[in-house]
């Protein structure tokens, strides 16, 4: 397969990912196939976003990394010292992707490290490893193109997460703003009593203790539930089970109390 055909394969991956949920495992699988190497997509903190193994390495320490989906902190930190594509690193380098304790088994191994950059910042690192055979110039072109694709997907995922977070925050603010003064007071006491993200409480006891009617509590809970902020379920004489669905709620409520 020539460079153009391999580039087209990677283009196909990009077109598929552009309209779907980001799957770094699938991206790593495609890169393994195109680049014929072990492929690791590593986050800023050393987390394995996706990986695909072309040549199995029988080493317990390496297997543990893959199970935990996490490279050790010293290695992850070292990767960030690599500012540009560094190719054909041997087993004696601190940047090798092969276990140094099995030095003699991997004498011919080659590691290539490609920084993943997007939006002007370092987003992660693409680490490629072969038991033998150097990475050629064509391989490096494909590796850098792959890193660009991954960078775009990381940025897209970040943007989606930011959008989701902003939407959740807006929903909470609208729900809180819909409460009357007495309902807001009731909600503050309810979640102070709850002491976490879910639990059981008896509305009548809170109403008596705080000096408000039970209907105020019921109305306040209904407003939050209709906004999708919480879910509640009556358990009869035992009370009402409440679970917070929006993880921004307690923070916004606490911020309101602080003001």
From Swiss-Prot:
Family statement: Belongs to the CodY family.
Cellular-component GO terms for this entry: cytoplasm
Function recorded in the entry: DNA-binding global transcriptional regulator which is involved in the adaptive response to starvation and acts by directly or indirectly controlling the expression of numerous genes in response to nutrient availability. During rapid exponential growth, CodY is highly active and represses genes whose products allow adaptation to nutrient depletion.
Coiled-coil boundaries: none
Gene3D superfamilies in the cross-refs: 3.30.450.40, Winged helix-like DNA-binding domain superfamily/Winged helix DNA-binding domain
InterPro entries the UniProt entry points to: CodY (IPR014154), GAF-like_dom_sf (IPR029016), GTP_trans_reg_CodY_C (IPR013198), Transc_reg_CodY_N (IPR010312), WH-like_DNA-bd_sf (IPR036388), WH_DNA-bd_sf (IPR036390)
Single Gene Ontology MF annotation: DNA binding
Keywords from the named record: Cytoplasm, DNA-binding, Repressor, Transcription, Transcription regulation
Keyword Transcription regulation in record: yes
Origin species: Exiguobacterium sp. (strain ATCC BAA-1283 / AT1b)
Gene this chain is encoded by: codY
Protein name per UniProt: Global transcriptional regulator CodY
GO biological process: one example: negative regulation of DNA-templated transcription
Location of this chain's protein in the cell: Cytoplasm
UniProt main location, coarse: cytoplasm
């Amino acid at each position: 397969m020539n460079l153009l055909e391999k580039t087209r394969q990677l283009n196909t991956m990009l077109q598929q990912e552009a309209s779907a949920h980001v799957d770094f495992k699938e991206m790593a699988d495609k890169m393994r196939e195109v680049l014929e190497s072990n492929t690791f997509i590593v986050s800023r903190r050393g987390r394995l976003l996706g990986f695909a193994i072309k040549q199995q390495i029988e080493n317990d320490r390496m297997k543990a990394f893959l199970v935990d989906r996490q490279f050790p902190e010293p290695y992850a930190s070292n990767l960030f010292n690599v500012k540009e594509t560094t190719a054909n690193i041997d087993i004696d380098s601190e940047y090798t992707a092969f276990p140094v304790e099995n030095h003699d088994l991997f004498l011919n191994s080659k590691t290539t490290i490609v920084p993943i950059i997007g939006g002007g910042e370092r987003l992660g690192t693409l680490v490629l490893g072969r038991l033998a055979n150097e990475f050629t110039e064509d391989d490096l072109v494909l590796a850098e193109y792959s890193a660009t694709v991954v960078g775009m997907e990381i940025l897209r995922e970040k943007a989606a997460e930011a959008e989701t977070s902003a939407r959740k925050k807006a929903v909470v603010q609208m729900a809180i703003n819909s409460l009357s003064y007495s309902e807001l007071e009731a909600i503050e006491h309810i979640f102070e009593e709850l002491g976490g993200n879910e639990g059981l409480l008896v509305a009548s006891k809170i109403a008596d203790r705080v000096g408000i009617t039970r209907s105020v509590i019921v109305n306040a809970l209904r407003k939050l539930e209709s906004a999708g902020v919480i879910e509640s379920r009556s358990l009869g004489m035992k009370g009402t089970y409440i679970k917070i669905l929006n993880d921004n709620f307690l923070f916004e409520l606490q911020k309101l109390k602080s003001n």
